[in-house]
Every structure is written in structure tokens, then in C-alpha cells.
Amino acid sequence: MRILIVSEDIPFPNMGGLAKHALNLARALVRAGHHVDLLGCDEHPIDVCGEEGKFGGRFIGELNGHHAGWKEISFGMFMPPKRPSIARNFAKIILRHAPNYDVIHYHGHIPNVARYLPPDVNFVQTRHDQGGDCFRHTRFREGQICDSIDPAECAKCINPTPNAIQRAVSKAAVVRFRRDVAQSFRAHKTVFVSDLLSRNFARCAGPGPWGTTVHNFVDRNALEKVRHAASLLPPREGFHVFIAAKLYPAKGVEQFLHALAPRLPKGMVVTVAGDGPDEKRMREKFEGSQIEFLGWCAPDRTLKLASMANAIVVPSVWEEPCATTVLEGLFLGKPTFALRRGGTPELAVYEAEPGQLRLHDDMASLVSDLVTFDPGTRYGFAAEGLGCADRAAQQLLEIYRSPPGGHHRV
């Protein structure tokens, strides 16, 4: 097949999980013998991604306009025309290239784009976050998971104390956007990276079917090479805990360290890889001989550090849709500690052995489990092919080959 992958998150020097997922998929599709090109943002050449940007096809940098603010911050309200305008622009760009491909697969943050594509275009989008009904994409506000379906409540996400006009205009923007997204999902094929995302969207939009679920995936061959290299190193003394996360409230790193610090056992060392708006404060509060902050780390270094640890902690307090860091921890053979929320419980199917994914209802119980856990615990390998990009690519190819516009179950 001739396949066009589309993502405004590519290319950038430090790419997030969505971009890496799309590139990983592109490489898997090329390995399977398909022609794959990538339509991305026009801000940088693909070279800024380094080795991560190599996928075996042509890069087309044309997507633009999605960073426009429309003075929403200045006015303290969401503007109803903003997201339809961005979606129309993306659709226009996509349609310039659609005749050259058998299928278009979109990975991005403009879920209403399908609303502006003709029904005969074979278009698939993967939803990686909760941006189908939440302008913040996270369903997380004031340190708590947000489960409100009232569009008027969304006004507080741009202005904590909206006046009547701001509240009414923001509500109108959310109502229109959610309606357009629902029309998009009805008109074209939609993939969710977890059942959690599908359920949460149905909470606002009503019963579906809204799409099908294909979990995130990883390059298991690459991970197993990293794992093997780590196994050849001499064992380190102590209990080494590794966290890779952006340092801001939703990721829960500060809450985890706050709970752990008073109980930190002698010999336990916690290494945090990642940067973010809370990094400076967290360094000042927690950094010491047993808690170290590395700042942003390149992906290869991050995986090497994870492979050398005795345990992985993914302390997110928001509803992670399908955390790649959890998958990486499991496939590296590590006990992986996380909260029982979001799409994370679904990832227990990727355990090598029962109990490898250690889920907890709150941070206190997670920390209690961690500080009493045997750092010498080892896990085997998950079933061959499970969670790998090549298997997911075959699932997605089945969706690609189904008729345009319909829902497809895998």
C-alpha cells in the first residue's frame, strides 16, 4: 500500500511519545514492504530529529497554523471558530496529497479534521489523548482528574474565574468542537490507544461505536538489545529506581517524591530523567545523594538508564491513555510501579509474569510496596511479538484495507 502518515508533532528536536509512536509505525510499515511518506510540520527539516527521524520514506513539511492562539489567553475564553479553522486548514493540506495514497493515517491533536474530509477519502486517525472532548487533552485540572461533561465547566481551564460572557463563549466553543469531533468519528475510521479513551469519549458523546482500540507499541527488538547489554554489566549495589517523565503536576513525580522522601531506605537511589516547569523547584526540594535529577535525556540514554535500574516507577496522577514508559519497563523485564488509573491497568496483558505491573490505588500504597520490594527480583520475557510495532502494523493494515468511512473492529 501507499501510506501517508500525518502528524504536526513531527519533526522537532525533542519529540514526545506521539511523534515517536508515529515514526515507529512508519518504520514497521516500511519493513512490511509498504511505501510510507510522512506529512509533518513546516517549522523544521526532518534532520532535526537525528536518527529518530529516519523511517525509510519521504518527509513533506507543510502542516501549519495550529500554533495560532486566537488571543484566547488575552480574552480569557475559548474561541468557537479557532479549532474548526485549524481543522479546515489541515484538511486542505491533506487533500492536496490524498490522491497519491491508498490511506491517510493521522496522529495528532486536531481530532475534528476528519469533519472536513470527503467520505471517499480513506482516512484513519489514532487518538492518543483525551483531546476529543477536552481542550487541554488531559482531563486534568487543579491537580485532579476531571470527569465533568458540562461544557460550561471547561471555561475554568482557560480562566479560573470566568465572567458570564467568557463562560458562555467558551461553552459554545466546546459544544461546537465536541459535535464536530463526533461527526468526524462517525464519518471516518478512528483508533484509540486504549479502551479508556473510547469510554471517556462516550461519556460526553453517548454510546458508539466510536472506533476500535489498538494499544501503543514499542520496538521490542531494540529494547531486547538494550536489555541484553545491561545484563552483561556487573551488578550495582543498592536499589536503583528510575523515573522518566516530564516534570509537571499531571505526571505525579513531585507527589511520589513527597511520599517517598520521609521513608527513603538506606541504599535506595532514585534517578529522574526529564525536564519541565517544575524541575527547578523539585531539585531544590528533593535533590541529594539518594535522589538525582538528570534533566532531559536523549532516548537512547533514557532506555539505557531504565535497563540498569532495579525498578521503574510511572507515578502519573492523571489518566495516562497508554503509557509507553510502562510498556518499556515491562519489556525491559523490570518491576513497574504505577497507579491504577487511566489506561494503565489495560497494560497488564504485556506482563512477562503476574505481578510485574504493580498497580496501586494511591501514592502511599505504591511507596509502601516499593520500599519493601526485593530489588533482586527478575522477570522473564513476554510472549513473542506481543506489544511490538510489527504486530500492531498488521492490525492497522487490516483497518487501512477496510472501506473508507466505516467502523472496523480488530
Regions found by a protein language model. Give the residues of each.
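Conserved donor-binding/catalytic core segment of Leloir-type glycosyltransferases
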Residues: V191, L233-K251, L257-A261
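Short hydrophobic beta-strand element within catalytic cores of glycosyltransferases
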Residues: A311, P335-A338
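Nucleotide-activated donor-binding/catalytic signature segment of Leloir-type glycosyltransferases, i.e.
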Residues: K280-D300
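Membrane-proximal helix-turn-helix segments that form the acceptor-binding/catalytic region
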Residues: G131, Q144-T190, C204
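Acidic anion/phosphate-binding donor-loop and adjacent secondary structure
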Residues: A202-R203, T212, F217-G238
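Acidic donor-binding loop of glycosyltransferase active sites
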Residues: S307-P321
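Short alpha-helical donor nucleotide-sugar binding micro-motif in glycosyltransferases
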Residues: W296-C297, K304-A309
